[in-house]
């Protein structure tokens, strides 16, 4: 046999071996690039959140199959239809929301039939786009510091004013209730704030209660001598609002600023997005802000 024959067989064998090697490498790369499931990502969150995971919690899957491979993560304050549509358009099929998706704290609307057209269309949209919705509320608040509060303090630029003995309390440079409300609205991107109290009252002692803490915690904050103004997300008008109005009428140096639930916690979920990126890899993570639903008539 000629040397050319052996050379040809050698290169043929080498070529087959190279192809096999490339095939194995490629298959290994595919295995490494396999998209994580929503369930796997939640397990990572549980491992990194830094507080014991509670059995009784609203931090559970609300829609979709948890074993769905994740194409992208949309982190949001509230999984409204608008947020879901934007997430789907960006190929983000795993939505992590702070607040309920289906109009009730437990995501089971009381007194609403499953045939309700709004509820039904929202469920159908999630199913059509192979989306998974998971709530991250309790344990994000349980972190030290509270994840929502941390994000809000950063957004407001109040880090240097925050009290060590009372993390929800702040000692600001002297301002008025009017200026405080206006500056808060500007920083949080909301023009729809409501205020109880004298707009010209000079204040320095502030308390921040994001979201909807409830009457007991809100009034306990307002009754403190070291709190002149309480900023809340939302509250019942016949509870904390009435209490604040009575305090003002009685001549007490008190004011209440109602920010709105979404803008009062939104920056906290943007903070969550940044935190997730420190340990969740191999998948796109984006903060999708919820829009302020209210507007002012002109």
Regions of interest found by a model, annotated:
Residues 8, 20-298:
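Hydrophobic structural segments
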Residues 2-15:
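Bacterial N-terminal signal peptides that target proteins for export
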């Amino acid at each position: 046999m000629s040397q050319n024959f052996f050379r040809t067989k050698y290169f043929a064998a080498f070529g087959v071996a190279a192809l096999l090697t490339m095939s194995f490498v490629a298959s290994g790369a595919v295995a490494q690039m396999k998209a994580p499931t929503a369930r796997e990502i939640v397990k990572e969150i549980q491992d990194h959140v830094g507080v014991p995971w509670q059995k009784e919690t609203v931090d559970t899957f609300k829609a979709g199959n948890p074993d769905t491979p994740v194409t992208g993560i949309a982190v949001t304050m509230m999984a409204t239809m608008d947020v879901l549509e934007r997430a789907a358009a960006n190929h983000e099929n795993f939505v992590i929301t702070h607040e309920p998706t289906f109009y009730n704290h437990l995501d089971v609307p009381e007194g609403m039939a499953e045939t309700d057209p709004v509820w039904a269309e929202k469920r159908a949209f999630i199913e059509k786009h192979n989306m998974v919705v998971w709530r991250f509320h309790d344990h994000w608040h349980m972190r030290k510091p509270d994840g929502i509060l941390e994000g809000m303090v950063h957004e407001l630029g109040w880090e240097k004013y925050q009290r060590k003995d009372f993390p929800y309390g702040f000692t600001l440079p002297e301002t008025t209730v009017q200026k405080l409300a206006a500056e808060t609205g500007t920083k949080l991107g909301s023009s729809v704030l409501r205020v109880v109290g004298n707009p010209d009252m000079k204040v320095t002692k502030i308390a921040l209660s994001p979201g909807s803490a409830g009457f007991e915690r809100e009034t306990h904050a307002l009754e403190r001598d070291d709190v002149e103004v309480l900023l809340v997300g939302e509250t019942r008008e016949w509870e904390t609002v009435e209490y604040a109005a009575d305090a003002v009428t009685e001549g007490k140096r008190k004011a209440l600023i109602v920010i709105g639930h979404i803008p009062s916690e939104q920056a906290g979920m943007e903070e969550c997005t940044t935190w997730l990126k420190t340990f969740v890899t191999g998948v796109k993570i984006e903060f999708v802000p919820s829009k302020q639903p209210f507007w002012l008539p002109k």
